[in-house]
Amino acid sequence: MRTDLPVVSFLCTALVLIPLPWHWRARNTATLSIIFWLGVINFTRGINSIVWAGKTINYAPVWCDITAKLIIGANWAFPSSTLCICRYLAQVSSPHHKIANASDKRRRMYFEIFMCAVLPIIAMALHYVVQGHRFDILEDFGCNPTTYVSVAALFIVYLPPLVLSLITLVYAGIALRWFVHRRAQFQAVLQSSNSGLTTGRYLRLIALSITEMLFATATTLFVLVITLEDNGLRPWVSWDFVHSDWLRVDQFAKVLAPQYFWDRYLLTWNMVPITSVIFFAFFGFGQEAKAEYARYFTLSDQNIPYQEQATTCSARLGARWNQYDEFDT
């Protein structure tokens, strides 16, 4: 059994859930979407790595159906959610931006719900078109989606996340450009936009988006290249041909697959944990995070009889957090 897989998965689940309370209060749809998808994928992977530790038996076919589709949806959801963030940043920093009224806010909310929730569901549904068989089970890793690699698969599975990532980088570049051009009065610009953003939070969101999308783009290209190298593009003969053996479940034991296969899979598997750590690094040490931690410790102090010790502890923690102010100036 690989104990590192469930440990990493559940640890990353906890990390991405830490910023949830203040983002929930802010009703930031795009950021909540990232938290949801990272949390769900990390958690289900942790379960998979326990259930299928050293095994490839098809214990839970319905569970695998669900988790395999969630992976497909997440591949679209990560870049589409980040696109929503960068699009909003580019809008609020633009010199042509007007203060949003109730109608504008509703349109933005509907757009973000479509991009963050509806679009991934569409991706999961479309995946059935190129789903050659039900799913794969990999020893230690568990359920994995399968794709009939063809021209149709390029346009349904591989290219959309790449295109979304590139569009996100364009929006991030526009947002960064407006910051550079208007940096002298940028805090006033953000205040006048009624966005609730500070300069530090604005830069942190841009940095997060660029980092995650560069990483996601590189990973997507890597997966696409090795998939084409290993399998090439298979001909799309007909719907019946592609789905002729749809109920099949392929099981991959460690001893039956070459080592390079497992090395490549582990490399791509690590994309979600790394993305989770990046997300926490940007959101777990900001001003709003420190305020939330202070609030938590204040509530905890009320239940501790030794107030002097609690006050001293809180003061030390406060001093320690102050060294993370670089994004909030």
Model regions and ranges:
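Membrane-proximal first intracellular loop
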Residues: M1-C116
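Juxtamembrane membrane-interface segments at transmembrane-helix boundaries in membrane proteins
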Residues: M1-V8, I57-L70, S103-K105, E139-V157, ...
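Cytoplasm-facing ends of alpha-helical transmembrane segments in multi-pass membrane proteins
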Residues: A14-P21, G46, I72-I99, E112-Q131, ...
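Class A (rhodopsin-like) GPCR intracellular loop-transmembrane helix junctions
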Residues: R27-F36, C64-K69, N101-I121, S150-L159, ...
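Membrane-helix interface motif
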Residues: I50-K55, Y128-F141, F179, L224-S238
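Intrinsically disordered, low-complexity terminal tails of fungal membrane proteins
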Residues: R106, H181-L203, F285-T329
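Extracellular-loop-to-transmembrane junctions of the mid-late helices
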Residues: V130, L138-F179, T199-I226
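Intracellular effector-coupling site of seven-transmembrane GPCRs
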Residues: F186-L224, D240-L266
